Amino acid sequence: MQVSDFHFDLPDELIARYPMTERTASRLLQLDGQTGALRHGQFVDVLDQLNPGDLLVFNNTRVIPARMFGQKASGGKLEVLVERMLDEHSVLAHVRSSKSPKPGTRLILDGGADGEKVEAEMRARHDALFEIHFLDPRPVLEILEAIGHMPLPPYIDRPDEDADKERYQTVYNQKPGAVAAPTAGLHFDEPLLEKIRAKGVETAFVTLHVGAGTFQPVRVDKIEDHHMHSEYAEVPQEVVDAIAATRARGGRVIAVGTTSVRSLESAAKVTLAQGKPLAPFFSDTDIFIFPGYQFQVVDAMVTNFHLPESTLIMLVSAFAGYDNVMSAYQAAVAEQYRFFSYGDAMFVTRRRAQA
Protein backbone atom coordinates (compact mmCIF):
# COMPACT_ATOMS: atom_id res chain seq x y z
CA MET A 1 0.00 0.00 0.00
CA GLN A 2 1.02 3.60 -0.53
CA VAL A 3 1.47 6.05 2.34
CA SER A 4 -0.82 8.40 0.42
CA ASP A 5 -3.64 5.85 0.83
CA PHE A 6 -3.84 7.02 4.44
CA HIS A 7 -4.28 10.70 3.67
CA PHE A 8 -7.37 12.62 4.70
CA ASP A 9 -8.11 16.33 4.72
CA LEU A 10 -8.28 17.80 8.20
CA PRO A 11 -9.36 21.40 8.83
CA ASP A 12 -6.90 23.14 11.15
CA GLU A 13 -9.67 24.12 13.57
CA LEU A 14 -10.30 20.44 14.39
CA ILE A 15 -6.83 20.05 15.92
CA ALA A 16 -7.33 20.18 19.70
CA ARG A 17 -4.78 22.54 21.23
CA TYR A 18 -6.18 22.32 24.75
CA PRO A 19 -7.87 19.45 26.60
CA MET A 20 -11.52 19.48 27.62
CA THR A 21 -12.21 20.85 31.10
CA GLU A 22 -12.99 17.33 32.34
CA ARG A 23 -11.08 14.27 31.14
CA THR A 24 -14.24 12.29 30.43
CA ALA A 25 -15.98 15.17 28.59
CA SER A 26 -14.51 14.13 25.24
CA ARG A 27 -16.62 12.51 22.57
CA LEU A 28 -16.39 8.84 21.60
CA LEU A 29 -16.83 7.42 18.11
CA GLN A 30 -17.54 3.70 18.24
CA LEU A 31 -16.46 1.62 15.23
CA ASP A 32 -17.49 -1.99 14.71
CA GLY A 33 -14.54 -3.43 12.83
CA GLN A 34 -16.61 -6.32 11.52
CA THR A 35 -19.46 -4.32 9.95
CA GLY A 36 -18.04 -0.79 9.73
CA ALA A 37 -21.03 0.51 11.71
CA LEU A 38 -20.49 3.78 13.58
CA ARG A 39 -22.09 5.14 16.73
CA HIS A 40 -21.54 8.65 18.06
CA GLY A 41 -21.49 9.35 21.79
CA GLN A 42 -19.57 10.65 24.79
CA PHE A 43 -16.46 9.11 26.30
CA VAL A 44 -18.34 7.95 29.40
CA ASP A 45 -20.23 5.62 27.02
CA VAL A 46 -17.08 3.48 26.95
CA LEU A 47 -18.46 1.87 30.11
CA ASP A 48 -21.35 0.44 28.07
CA GLN A 49 -18.86 -1.18 25.67
CA LEU A 50 -17.13 -3.12 28.45
CA ASN A 51 -18.39 -6.46 29.72
CA PRO A 52 -17.75 -8.16 33.07
CA GLY A 53 -14.73 -10.39 32.58
CA ASP A 54 -13.07 -8.14 30.01
CA LEU A 55 -9.49 -6.96 30.59
CA LEU A 56 -8.45 -3.35 30.01
CA VAL A 57 -4.71 -2.95 29.43
CA PHE A 58 -3.23 0.51 30.08
CA ASN A 59 0.23 1.98 29.47
CA ASN A 60 1.52 3.35 32.78
CA THR A 61 4.46 5.33 31.41
CA ARG A 62 4.97 8.83 32.80
CA VAL A 63 5.82 11.76 30.53
CA ILE A 64 9.03 13.49 31.61
CA PRO A 65 9.58 17.27 31.17
CA ALA A 66 11.90 16.42 28.30
CA ARG A 67 12.26 19.76 26.49
CA MET A 68 15.02 22.17 27.55
CA PHE A 69 16.28 25.46 26.17
CA GLY A 70 19.71 27.02 26.43
CA GLN A 71 22.84 27.83 24.51
CA LYS A 72 26.26 26.49 23.71
CA ALA A 73 29.07 27.90 25.81
CA SER A 74 30.10 29.72 22.62
CA GLY A 75 26.73 31.49 22.57
CA GLY A 76 24.55 29.80 19.93
CA LYS A 77 20.98 29.07 21.04
CA LEU A 78 19.68 25.51 21.14
CA GLU A 79 16.73 23.34 22.07
CA VAL A 80 17.15 19.87 23.57
CA LEU A 81 14.46 17.16 23.50
CA VAL A 82 15.37 14.10 25.53
CA GLU A 83 14.54 10.87 23.72
CA ARG A 84 15.81 8.38 26.30
CA MET A 85 17.54 8.35 29.67
CA LEU A 86 20.75 6.30 29.55
CA ASP A 87 21.69 6.42 33.22
CA GLU A 88 21.45 8.77 36.21
CA HIS A 89 23.45 11.51 34.46
CA SER A 90 23.23 10.92 30.70
CA VAL A 91 20.55 11.05 28.02
CA LEU A 92 20.08 10.57 24.30
CA ALA A 93 18.46 13.67 22.84
CA HIS A 94 17.49 15.55 19.73
CA VAL A 95 19.27 18.91 19.52
CA ARG A 96 18.04 21.82 17.43
CA SER A 97 20.58 24.56 16.81
CA SER A 98 22.04 26.54 13.92
CA LYS A 99 25.05 24.20 13.92
CA SER A 100 25.10 20.70 15.38
CA PRO A 101 27.26 20.55 18.52
CA LYS A 102 30.47 18.53 18.26
CA PRO A 103 31.68 16.09 20.93
CA GLY A 104 33.11 18.06 23.84
CA THR A 105 30.78 21.03 23.33
CA ARG A 106 29.60 22.57 26.62
CA LEU A 107 25.88 23.32 26.88
CA ILE A 108 24.29 25.78 29.29
CA LEU A 109 20.64 24.90 29.87
CA ASP A 110 18.28 27.50 31.29
CA GLY A 111 15.95 26.98 34.20
CA GLY A 112 12.60 28.52 35.00
CA ALA A 113 11.69 31.78 36.66
CA ASP A 114 14.48 31.49 39.24
CA GLY A 115 17.12 31.70 36.51
CA GLU A 116 18.74 28.36 37.37
CA LYS A 117 21.29 27.11 34.85
CA VAL A 118 22.57 23.58 34.37
CA GLU A 119 25.77 22.70 32.52
CA ALA A 120 26.07 19.66 30.30
CA GLU A 121 28.44 18.27 27.70
CA MET A 122 27.79 16.65 24.34
CA ARG A 123 29.77 13.41 24.46
CA ALA A 124 28.93 11.61 21.21
CA ARG A 125 26.57 11.51 18.27
CA HIS A 126 24.48 8.47 17.33
CA ASP A 127 22.86 9.16 13.95
CA ALA A 128 20.18 11.80 14.65
CA LEU A 129 20.62 11.63 18.43
CA PHE A 130 23.19 13.25 20.70
CA GLU A 131 24.57 11.72 23.89
CA ILE A 132 24.49 14.43 26.55
CA HIS A 133 26.10 14.14 29.98
CA PHE A 134 24.93 16.48 32.75
CA LEU A 135 27.71 18.12 34.78
CA ASP A 136 25.46 18.29 37.82
CA PRO A 137 25.33 15.93 40.81
CA ARG A 138 21.55 15.57 40.67
CA PRO A 139 19.92 12.65 38.82
CA VAL A 140 18.59 13.37 35.34
CA LEU A 141 14.95 13.17 36.43
CA GLU A 142 15.51 15.74 39.16
CA ILE A 143 17.20 18.09 36.69
CA LEU A 144 14.36 17.71 34.19
CA GLU A 145 11.77 18.39 36.88
CA ALA A 146 13.66 21.56 37.77
CA ILE A 147 14.30 23.05 34.32
CA GLY A 148 12.44 20.95 31.74
CA HIS A 149 9.23 21.73 29.86
CA MET A 150 6.44 19.30 28.98
CA PRO A 151 7.15 18.09 25.42
CA LEU A 152 3.87 18.96 23.75
CA PRO A 153 3.54 17.62 20.19
CA PRO A 154 4.41 20.05 17.39
CA TYR A 155 0.83 20.23 16.10
CA ILE A 156 -0.42 21.69 19.40
CA ASP A 157 1.57 24.73 18.31
CA ARG A 158 1.79 26.63 21.60
CA PRO A 159 4.18 26.86 24.55
CA ASP A 160 3.55 24.45 27.40
CA GLU A 161 1.62 25.79 30.38
CA ASP A 162 1.43 24.73 34.03
CA ALA A 163 -1.85 22.88 33.41
CA ASP A 164 -0.11 20.60 30.90
CA LYS A 165 1.97 19.07 33.70
CA GLU A 166 -1.23 17.40 34.89
CA ARG A 167 -3.34 17.11 31.74
CA TYR A 168 -0.64 15.75 29.40
CA GLN A 169 -0.31 12.86 31.84
CA THR A 170 -2.58 9.91 32.62
CA VAL A 171 -3.98 9.66 36.15
CA TYR A 172 -2.42 6.19 36.53
CA ASN A 173 1.11 7.02 35.34
CA GLN A 174 3.88 5.28 37.29
CA LYS A 175 7.12 4.85 35.36
CA PRO A 176 8.96 7.96 34.07
CA GLY A 177 10.45 7.77 30.60
CA ALA A 178 8.02 8.89 27.88
CA VAL A 179 8.45 12.06 25.84
CA ALA A 180 4.89 11.86 24.53
CA ALA A 181 1.73 10.85 26.34
CA PRO A 182 -0.14 7.60 25.65
CA THR A 183 -3.05 9.82 24.73
CA ALA A 184 -5.97 7.35 24.74
CA GLY A 185 -5.44 7.12 28.48
CA LEU A 186 -5.91 10.86 29.02
CA HIS A 187 -9.71 10.40 28.91
CA PHE A 188 -9.86 8.22 32.03
CA ASP A 189 -10.29 9.74 35.49
CA GLU A 190 -10.51 7.98 38.85
CA PRO A 191 -14.34 7.97 39.09
CA LEU A 192 -14.59 6.31 35.67
CA LEU A 193 -11.90 3.77 36.58
CA GLU A 194 -13.85 2.95 39.77
CA LYS A 195 -17.03 2.36 37.73
CA ILE A 196 -15.09 0.14 35.33
CA ARG A 197 -13.77 -2.00 38.19
CA ALA A 198 -17.21 -2.09 39.84
CA LYS A 199 -18.62 -3.56 36.62
CA GLY A 200 -16.30 -6.53 36.93
CA VAL A 201 -13.79 -5.40 34.32
CA GLU A 202 -10.18 -6.28 35.17
CA THR A 203 -7.28 -3.89 34.60
CA ALA A 204 -3.58 -4.46 33.90
CA PHE A 205 -0.60 -2.26 33.07
CA VAL A 206 2.14 -2.50 30.49
CA THR A 207 4.85 0.12 29.98
CA LEU A 208 5.99 1.63 26.71
CA HIS A 209 8.10 4.77 26.91
CA VAL A 210 6.76 6.72 23.94
CA GLY A 211 9.57 8.37 21.97
CA ALA A 212 9.64 11.52 19.88
CA GLY A 213 9.78 9.29 16.82
CA THR A 214 6.03 8.86 17.17
CA PHE A 215 5.67 12.31 15.57
CA GLN A 216 8.11 11.71 12.73
CA PRO A 217 6.46 11.62 9.29
CA VAL A 218 6.70 8.50 7.16
CA ARG A 219 9.26 9.45 4.51
CA VAL A 220 8.75 6.63 2.00
CA ASP A 221 6.07 6.05 -0.63
CA LYS A 222 5.36 2.39 0.09
CA ILE A 223 4.47 1.62 3.69
CA GLU A 224 6.36 -1.69 3.52
CA ASP A 225 9.60 0.31 3.10
CA HIS A 226 9.17 2.22 6.36
CA HIS A 227 11.40 1.41 9.34
CA MET A 228 9.88 2.15 12.74
CA HIS A 229 11.73 3.95 15.50
CA SER A 230 12.58 1.85 18.54
CA GLU A 231 10.97 2.25 21.97
CA TYR A 232 11.38 0.38 25.25
CA ALA A 233 8.43 -1.75 26.38
CA GLU A 234 7.58 -3.97 29.34
CA VAL A 235 4.89 -6.65 29.52
CA PRO A 236 5.28 -8.14 33.02
CA GLN A 237 4.25 -11.60 34.19
CA GLU A 238 1.09 -10.30 35.87
CA VAL A 239 -0.16 -9.01 32.51
CA VAL A 240 0.56 -12.37 30.86
CA ASP A 241 -1.36 -14.10 33.67
CA ALA A 242 -4.26 -11.63 33.41
CA ILE A 243 -4.55 -12.27 29.66
CA ALA A 244 -4.57 -16.05 30.19
CA ALA A 245 -7.28 -15.70 32.85
CA THR A 246 -9.31 -13.45 30.55
CA ARG A 247 -9.12 -15.98 27.72
CA ALA A 248 -10.13 -18.78 30.11
CA ARG A 249 -13.30 -16.96 31.17
CA GLY A 250 -14.22 -15.88 27.65
CA GLY A 251 -13.46 -12.19 28.12
CA ARG A 252 -11.86 -9.74 25.70
CA VAL A 253 -8.45 -8.09 25.86
CA ILE A 254 -9.01 -4.37 25.29
CA ALA A 255 -5.95 -2.18 24.82
CA VAL A 256 -6.06 1.47 25.83
CA GLY A 257 -3.99 3.17 23.16
CA THR A 258 -1.79 2.12 20.26
CA THR A 259 1.20 1.89 22.63
CA SER A 260 -0.57 -0.81 24.66
CA VAL A 261 -1.42 -2.61 21.41
CA ARG A 262 2.19 -2.48 20.26
CA SER A 263 3.49 -3.68 23.64
CA LEU A 264 1.19 -6.71 23.73
CA GLU A 265 1.70 -7.61 20.09
CA SER A 266 5.49 -7.25 20.50
CA ALA A 267 5.42 -9.81 23.29
CA ALA A 268 3.27 -12.10 21.15
CA LYS A 269 5.57 -11.73 18.15
CA VAL A 270 8.45 -13.21 20.15
CA THR A 271 6.69 -16.24 21.63
CA LEU A 272 3.51 -17.11 19.76
CA ALA A 273 5.38 -17.16 16.45
CA GLN A 274 7.40 -20.05 17.91
CA GLY A 275 4.25 -21.86 18.96
CA LYS A 276 4.86 -20.99 22.61
CA PRO A 277 2.40 -19.30 24.98
CA LEU A 278 2.62 -15.57 25.62
CA ALA A 279 5.56 -14.70 27.90
CA PRO A 280 6.83 -11.55 29.65
CA PHE A 281 8.61 -9.01 27.45
CA PHE A 282 11.23 -6.48 28.57
CA SER A 283 12.97 -5.09 25.52
CA ASP A 284 13.06 -2.48 22.79
CA THR A 285 10.43 -2.86 20.10
CA ASP A 286 10.21 -1.48 16.59
CA ILE A 287 7.07 -3.39 15.64
CA PHE A 288 5.28 -1.79 12.69
CA ILE A 289 1.64 -2.80 12.35
CA PHE A 290 -0.10 -2.07 9.05
CA PRO A 291 -2.89 -3.70 7.00
CA GLY A 292 -2.24 -7.40 6.57
CA TYR A 293 -0.94 -7.84 10.12
CA GLN A 294 -2.54 -10.72 12.05
CA PHE A 295 -3.31 -9.64 15.62
CA GLN A 296 -2.50 -12.21 18.30
CA VAL A 297 -3.69 -10.63 21.55
CA VAL A 298 -5.93 -7.58 21.26
CA ASP A 299 -9.70 -7.82 20.63
CA ALA A 300 -10.71 -4.15 20.97
CA MET A 301 -9.00 -0.84 21.56
CA VAL A 302 -9.51 2.71 22.74
CA THR A 303 -7.57 5.20 20.65
CA ASN A 304 -7.48 8.87 19.72
CA PHE A 305 -7.72 10.26 16.18
CA HIS A 306 -4.32 10.19 14.50
CA LEU A 307 -2.40 12.23 11.93
CA PRO A 308 -2.94 11.63 8.22
CA GLU A 309 -0.39 9.21 6.74
CA SER A 310 0.91 8.28 10.21
CA THR A 311 1.93 4.80 11.35
CA LEU A 312 -0.83 5.03 13.97
CA ILE A 313 -3.70 5.37 11.50
CA MET A 314 -2.09 2.44 9.66
CA LEU A 315 -2.24 0.38 12.87
CA VAL A 316 -5.92 1.18 13.43
CA SER A 317 -6.62 0.33 9.78
CA ALA A 318 -4.92 -3.04 10.24
CA PHE A 319 -7.12 -3.62 13.28
CA ALA A 320 -10.55 -2.62 12.00
CA GLY A 321 -10.16 -2.68 8.22
CA TYR A 322 -8.80 0.05 5.96
CA ASP A 323 -12.13 1.04 4.39
CA ASN A 324 -13.90 1.05 7.77
CA VAL A 325 -11.29 3.29 9.38
CA MET A 326 -10.98 5.79 6.54
CA SER A 327 -14.78 6.08 6.40
CA ALA A 328 -14.87 6.59 10.16
CA TYR A 329 -12.30 9.38 9.87
CA GLN A 330 -14.35 11.07 7.15
CA ALA A 331 -17.38 10.89 9.43
CA ALA A 332 -15.35 12.28 12.34
CA VAL A 333 -14.27 15.28 10.27
CA ALA A 334 -17.85 15.85 9.10
CA GLU A 335 -19.11 15.67 12.70
CA GLN A 336 -16.30 17.97 13.87
CA TYR A 337 -14.62 15.64 16.32
CA ARG A 338 -11.47 17.03 17.92
CA PHE A 339 -8.25 15.43 16.67
CA PHE A 340 -4.88 14.28 18.03
CA SER A 341 -3.42 14.20 21.56
CA TYR A 342 -5.90 16.47 23.34
CA GLY A 343 -8.78 15.44 21.09
CA ASP A 344 -11.62 12.91 21.14
CA ALA A 345 -11.45 9.12 21.14
CA MET A 346 -12.62 5.99 19.36
CA PHE A 347 -13.66 2.59 20.68
CA VAL A 348 -12.77 0.09 17.97
CA THR A 349 -13.47 -3.63 17.77
CA ARG A 350 -11.28 -5.92 15.73
CA ARG A 351 -12.14 -7.08 12.25
CA ARG A 352 -11.96 -10.87 12.17
CA ALA A 353 -10.68 -12.79 9.16
CA GLN A 354 -13.54 -14.01 7.01
CA ALA A 355 -14.05 -17.76 7.16
Curated annotation (Swiss-Prot):
The gene is queA. Pathway: tRNA modification; tRNA-queuosine biosynthesis. It is found in: Cytoplasm. PANTHER family: S-ADENOSYLMETHIONINE:TRNA RIBOSYLTRANSFERASE-ISOMERASE. GO terms for molecular function: S-adenosylmethionine:tRNA ribosyltransferase-isomerase activity. This is S-adenosylmethionine:tRNA ribosyltransferase-isomerase. Monomer. NCBIfam families: PRK00147.1 (NF001140), queA (TIGR00113). It catalyses: 7-aminomethyl-7-carbaguanosine(34) in tRNA + S-adenosyl-L-methionine = epoxyqueuosine(34) in tRNA + adenine + L-methionine + 2 H(+). Transfers and isomerizes the ribose moiety from AdoMet to the 7-aminomethyl group of 7-deazaguanine (preQ1-tRNA) to give epoxyqueuosine (oQ-tRNA). Keywords: Cytoplasm, Queuosine biosynthesis, S-adenosyl-L-methionine, Transferase. The keyword S-adenosyl-L-methionine applies. Its main location: cytoplasm. It comes from the Bacteria. One of its GO terms (biological process) is tRNA wobble guanine modification. Belongs to the QueA family.
